[in-house]
Structures are given as C-alpha cells and as structure tokens.
Amino acid sequence: TTLRTPIMLKGCETRSLAQEKLLVMALPTHEIMQQDLQKLTLKALSQYKIILSHRYRQYILSAFEEKGIFCDIYCECQDARTALNLAENGLGVAVLPASMQKLTSRVICREIIDVDLTTEILLAWRKERLPAEVQEFLAIW
C-alpha cells in the first residue's frame, strides 16, 4: 500500500517513492499573500489562522515549538482536501503538501523558508509478506 508520512509503522518495510514540501496555501487576496514575499517564515505564518490535516498537526506544532513560536491552529481537518477547500473559501491559510496545489486554481502557494517541512510518500508492506506485485515494482523502482 502507499502511505504518506508522518505515520507510525510497526512490522512494516517501506520504500520512499517521493518527497514533497508542505506549502502555505491561501487565496490571492488573503493578507499573507499580499506581502511582497515569495517565501514565508514560521513567525510570519504564526500571525494567521492555520488550517491543516490532522496528520500534520504534531509535525507542524513541533516546528513552531522548536523556534519558540506560538501558532493558531484554527481548524484541523480529517483530510487535506477539506483543508484546501476551507482555504479556498477564505477561512484561513492551509499548510499542505505541494501536490495539493494541482487540485485548484483558486489559491496561491508560498514556501516556508526557515524550516524543512517535508513529507514522503511510502510504499509499505508487512515484513513477513512481500506480495509478488510489490517485488516486481521494487525490481524496477
């Protein structure tokens, strides 16, 4: 199966298939996007209502805590599409994987420059059972 980090895996082997950064996504008219910045800092981001998928909550909070910055998690969604939809409707700024920007033309994205918020897509299988399909895929990957 394919999974996205961060995730706890016990009894599984994994292979990284892709990496991508988490980006700030908001409407072009949102105040955070009006700044003359192509990239943002965590401190700048902390001034706004943050929307995210529950999967990234601890990961993002840890990044803020390491810098000694408080942030406002305005809405924690069950999935990334819901978080994107809320940002599209102007309810805050979403922090989501870069690939999510392909799903909409309504938001623009900015990179967070002072922290590496990267997620991976993993191929995972149980240690004791490696399906033939996975073996074939791993042979060519």
Predicted regions and their residues:
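A late-sequence structural motif
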Residues: 109-141
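Short amphipathic alpha-helical segments
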Residues: 46-49, 71, 119-122
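Hydrophobic hinge/microswitch elements
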Residues: 56-108
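Secondary-structure junction motif
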Residues: 3-4, 32-33, 38-40, 46-67, ...
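Acidic, Gly/Pro-rich loop/turn segments at junctions of secondary structure
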Residues: 1-47, 98-107, 117
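Hydrophobic acceptor-binding patch used for acceptor engagement in glycosyltransferases
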Residues: 23, 49-51, 92-94
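Residue-level recognition of the GNAT/N-acetyltransferase active site
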Residues: 27, 53, 126
